[in-house]
């Protein structure tokens, strides 16, 4: 049996007496429900208008004269600055934390700050043969996300389409049963919307992106009675206002042409005229002076065939690159000599279908090429390669294969591909 000495009993009694004389104050804290609707007037979630709301809270005790930690609230401006620096492929996780974050990430405020702070990153939007939904990849092709199905008719779904990006908008145009249609996917809301239509709806045109705007030129206009016309008209889309503006027309009508934005100007290269003749000339548009300058014979060394795709061109830094499909090789343009320098073979089979089914784009400071691998004994699945020209001053490019591709196998024939910087 355990017995206590008198000295131990005394200590216990003293302790008990002390506890009776001192009242222990126990505070209860309310744990906030982060999914409770804020008591603010949110002005139109679907319109993408940013609403200032504090999603962070401070734990406060019921006893008003006491504060345990005095945790400061995270102010709205700081929230935006932090979220703007988070990789975009992590945003879906943040949207699950609470409704405040979800609403903020669905606004355009985050992407506006990303542009202002220079923390934008490229994403690749792609549609391969056999797919009914577009896929978005991060720049390393380690993460991907399926977009919602585009709610168009069956003619649009299975027909030829053009794709371009402006700001956070992915724009896809094509022919529906009765007319040429334009659909846009908004990155903030992850939803498809129809329109706004171009001033002159068209297909098979040239396009180039500059930040939040995109230029389109030339192409094929289809009348209501089915007649087709090659056009020389030019338009600019502003993703901030969701409007099209008519610009000065080109010197020549052209379809199956390609565009790029280089050194502050919109370039349109190649294509076919209204008589179906291949064009070796190009044109550059200076928006400041609203003028077009003809560039004779810029594609004079290019080979043409009856099944030739539009020129495969991409801009990295201040250099213009071309994938010459007939030779399956990469070239860089020398503006002073108006000629192209050969840089070596590309690791995909661009020659097989005259350039169709191959994506050739700029991805930040890298060149990106997607298609069927040119290597022997390769399965007919999509291969992705990148090369950084600045890392090879001797103009000897080295291609690095992205072998992950999210662990998903895609068809090697690429129907549409464009890069969004946001």
From Swiss-Prot:
Kelch repeats lie at residues 162-212, 213-264, 266-312, 314-361, 366-412. The keyword Transport does not apply. One of its GO terms (cellular component) is nucleus. InterPro entries: F-box/Kelch-repeat (IPR052439), Kelch-typ_b-propeller (IPR015915), Kelch_1 (IPR006652). Residues 68-114 form the F-box domain. Keywords: Kelch repeat, Repeat. It comes from the Eukaryota. SUPFAM superfamilies: Kelch motif. Pfam families: Kelch_1. Disulfide bonds: none annotated. This is F-box/kelch-repeat protein At3g27150.
């Amino acid at each position: 049996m355990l017995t206590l000495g008198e000295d131990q009993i005394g200590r216990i009694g003293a302790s008990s007496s002390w506890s009776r004389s001192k009242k222990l104050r126990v505070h209860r804290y309310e744990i906030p429900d982060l999914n409770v609707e804020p008591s603010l007037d949110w002005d139109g979630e679907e319109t993408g208008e940013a609403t200032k709301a504090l999603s962070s809270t401070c734990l406060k005790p019921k006893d008003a004269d006491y504060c345990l930690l005095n945790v400061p609230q995270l102010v709205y401006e700081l929230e935006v600055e932090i979220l703007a620096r988070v990789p975009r492929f992590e945003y879906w996780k943040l949207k699950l934390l609470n409704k405040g974050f979800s609403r903020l990430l669905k606004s355009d405020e985050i992407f506006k700050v990303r542009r202002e702070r220079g923390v934008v990153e490229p994403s690749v939007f792609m549609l391969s043969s056999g797919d009914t939904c577009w896929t978005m990849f991060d720049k390393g092709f380690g993460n991907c996300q399926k977009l919602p199905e585009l709610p168009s008719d069956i003619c649009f779904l299975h027909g030829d389409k053009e794709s371009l990006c402006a700001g956070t908008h992915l724009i896809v145009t094509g022919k529906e049963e009765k007319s040429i249609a334009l659909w846009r996917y908004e990155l903030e809301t992850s939803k498809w919307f129809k329109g706004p239509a171009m001033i002159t709806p068209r297909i098979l045109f040239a396009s180039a992106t500059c930040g939040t705007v995109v230029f389109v030129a030339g192409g094929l206009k289809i009348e209501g009675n089915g007649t087709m016309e090659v056009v020389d008209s030019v338009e600019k889309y502003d993703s901030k206002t969701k409007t099209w503006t008519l610009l000065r027309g080109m010197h020549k009508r052209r379809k199956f042409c390609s565009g790029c934005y280089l050194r502050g100007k919109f370039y349109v290269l190649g294509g076919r005229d209204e008589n179906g003749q291949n064009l070796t000339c190009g044109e550059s548009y200076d928006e400041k002076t609203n003028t077009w300058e003809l560039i004779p014979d810029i594609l004079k060394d290019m080979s043409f065939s009856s099944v030739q795709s539009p020129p495969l061109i991409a801009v990295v830094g201040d250099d213009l690159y071309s994938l010459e499909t007939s030779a399956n090789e990469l070239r860089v343009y020398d503006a002073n000599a108006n000629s192209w320098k050969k840089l070596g073979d590309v690791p995909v089979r661009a020659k097989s279908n005259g350039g169709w089914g191959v994506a050739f784009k700029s991805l930040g400071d890298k060149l990106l090429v997607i298609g069927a691998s040119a290597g022997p004994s390769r399965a007919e699945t999509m291969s992705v390669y990148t090369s950084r020209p600045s890392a090879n001053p001797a103009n000897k490019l080295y291609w690095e294969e992205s072998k992950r591709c999210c662990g998903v196998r895609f068809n090697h024939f690429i129907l549409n591909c464009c890069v969004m910087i946001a």
